[in-house]
Regions:
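Alpha-helical adaptor scaffolds
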Residues: 18, 23, 30-81
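Hydrophobic side-chain positions on well-ordered alpha-helices
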Residues: 9, 16, 55-56, 90
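Residue-level recognition of tetratricopeptide repeat
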Residues: 14, 53-54, 88, 122
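Alpha-solenoid helical repeat scaffolds
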Residues: 10, 43-50, 81-85, 101, ...
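Intrinsically disordered, low-complexity, charge-biased linker/tail regions
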Residues: 1-3, 8, 15-20, 63-64, ...
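A generic tandem-repeat structural signature
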Residues: 68-106
Length: 165
C-alpha cells in the first residue's frame, strides 16, 4: 500500500517539475522517499535524485542537492535521467565543465535522450578549432571550421557494392 502511495507521490512530483513548480515537487519527492524503504531500489534512488534537483531549484542548498544527485548516480549508474538531474544541479552551481561531462556520460548510456541532448545544446560548448596553434578567429580556422560543419551536416551516401556472382 505504501509503495503505491510512494509511486503516486513520485508521479505528482514529476508533474510538478514539468509545470516548473519545484517547491511543490520537493514535498512530493520527500514524501515518496519517506514512504519507500531505504533499499527501495531504483525508484527510491530516482526519488532521491529528483529531490536533489528540486532542492537546487527551489532553495539555495546547492551543495546538499549535488551530494544527493551524485549519490543517486553512484547507486544506479545506468539511468540517464539521473545524469540529467546532476548536470542541472551543476549548472545551478555554475560548474559548467562538470555539467558538460555529466551530460556526456549520460549520453553514452542513451545517445538520443531528449533532455540530455537539449541540455548540451543549451550549454553551447564549442568544438576545438581545426588548426589548434592558430587563434579561433583566424581566417584558416573559420574556413576549415565551416567546411567541417558542412561535411557533417551532409547526409552520407551509401555506396553500392557489386553483388557476388
Amino acid at each position: 500500500m505504501s509503495t503505491r502511495r510512494a509511486e503516486r507521490a513520485f508521479e505528482k512530483g514529476l508533474q510538478s517539475i514539468a509545470r516548473g513548480d519545484f517547491l511543490a515537487a520537493l514535498g512530493f519527492f520527500e514524501a515518496s522517499m519517506a514512504l519507500l524503504p531505504a533499499n527501495g531500489g531504483t525508484h527510491a534512488v530516482a526519488a532521491m535524485s529528483y529531490y536533489g534537483l528540486c532542492l537546487a531549484c527551489a532553495t539555495d542548498r546547492l551543495p546538499e542537492a549535488r551530494d544527493l544527485c551524485e549519490a543517486a548516480v553512484e547507486a544506479v549508474p545506468e539511468d540517464p535521467d539521473l545524469y540529467l538531474n546532476l548536470g542541472r544541479v551543476c549548472e545551478r552551481q555554475e560548474d559548467r565543465e562538470h555539467a558538460f561531462r555529466t551530460y556526456v556520460r549520460g549520453l553514452r548510456l542513451n545517445p538520443r535522450h531528449p533532455g540530455l541532448v537539449e541540455a548540451l545544446r543549451r550549454l553551447g560548448f564549442r568544438r576545438r578549432s581545426v588548426v589548434g596553434f592558430l587563434p579561433r578567429d583566424h581566417a584558416v580556422n573559420r574556413v576549415l571550421g565551416s567546411l567541417r560543419a558542412a561535411l557533417q551536416r551532409r547526409p552520407r551516401r551509401r555506396t553500392r557494392r557489386p553483388k557476388a556472382a
